[in-house]
A protein has these predicted regions:
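Small/aliphatic-rich secondary-structure junction motif
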Residues: 2-52, 74-85, 140-144
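Hydrophobic alpha-helical membrane-association signature
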Residues: 14, 62-66, 123
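Short, structured motif recognition centered on aromatic/hydrophobic residues
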Residues: 17, 21, 29-31, 65, ...
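A short acidic, glycine-rich active-site loop
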Residues: 51-62
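Short acidic active-site motifs
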Residues: 90-95, 123
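Glycine-rich, Arg-bearing micro-motifs that act as flexible, cationic patches
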Residues: 104-130, 144
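C-terminal, charge/polar-rich interaction regions
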Residues: 72, 81, 85, 97, ...
């Protein structure tokens, strides 16, 4: 079982479904958090011109993002062993790679209010065409 964790609250419903499914089927869970350098801010720059990035600090921060999103789930599902994967890569590419040995890939559906809430995000759309196992795209409730 594989779950994509993007670090936002939009991941929570997907994480919940993935833990439930892994527990129900008695399988391990792989929690994947992939990040790309194009999304980084100058918060991690060590150069006043914003050129050099502190890759160790970035990796530490990205591991913390995944740990924060998974907090509490292991206590709720003690029977589910979790392997954490944090990589600098496109989320769809890493999730697709993990899907080759998975029974199910679970991801959230991006979209923030209005018409966009009815659309799939780029990762979900990509995985629909490339994933090697069943794919579950979980709706995130729209905040009012």
């Amino acid at each position: 079982m594989v779950v994509g964790v993007d670090g936002t609250e939009n991941s929570e419903p997907a994480i919940a479904e993935a833990f439930e499914a892994a527990s129900l089927h008695g399988v391990d869970l792989v929690a994947v958090h992939a990040w790309r350098d194009s999304h980084l801010t100058t918060a991690f720059t060590s150069d006043p011109n914003g050129v050099a990035l502190d890759w160790d600090a970035i990796a530490t921060a990205e591991h913390a993002v995944l740990a924060e999103r998974l907090a509490g789930w292991k206590e709720k599902y003690p029977d589910v062993a979790v392997r954490r994967v944090v990589v600098k890569d496109r989320p769809a590419r890493q999730l697709n790679a993990e899907s080759t040995s998975a029974q199910l890939v679970v991801v959230g559906r991006r979209g923030r209010g209005g018409i966009s809430s009815m659309l799939l995000g780029s990762t979900s759309r990509h995985l629909m065409h490339t994933v090697w196992c069943p794919l579950l795209i979980v709706h995130s409730p729209v905040a009012s």
